[in-house]
């Protein structure tokens, strides 16, 4: 059985490194994209098992990227965890309306992120 693939769409290198370090001790394969446009293209290319989507992204926002992914057959049902550092009241609902399966506010503990990933994508 091949490793399950997670696409992480995040423009901040430090945040990407934190997730890289977290997932290198798991059975998941991590693929990265650095902006919303690249994230949509990469998701359609590789068809990941789960997507971690930052909301504040260059080119197109994470919200718009999620809308585009939900409109595409190959990614319409892929779990998407929206991650944001600008958590305001109602943002979680807006993210879910845009296509997020779950929502996580920064700063978050790596344990909380891994727990959420495993909820939608068990390692076994």
Per-region residue spans from a language model:
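Charged docking surfaces used in two-component/phosphorelay signaling
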Residues: 17-25
């Amino acid at each position: 059985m091949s490793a399950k693939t997670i696409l992480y769409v995040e423009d901040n290198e430090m945040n990407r490194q934190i997730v890289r370090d977290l997932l290198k001790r798991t059975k998941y394969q991590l693929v990265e994209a650095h902006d919303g446009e690249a994230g949509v293209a990469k998701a359609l290319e590789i068809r990941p098992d789960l997507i971690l989507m930052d909301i504040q992204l260059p080119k197109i926002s994470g919200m718009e990227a999620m809308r585009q992914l939900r409109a595409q057959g190959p990614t319409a049902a892929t779990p998407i965890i929206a991650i944001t550092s600008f958590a305001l009241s109602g943002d979680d609902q807006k993210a879910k309306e845009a296509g997020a399966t779950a929502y996580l506010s920064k700063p978050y503990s790596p344990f909380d992120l891994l727990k959420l990933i495993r909820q939608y994508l068990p390692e076994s």
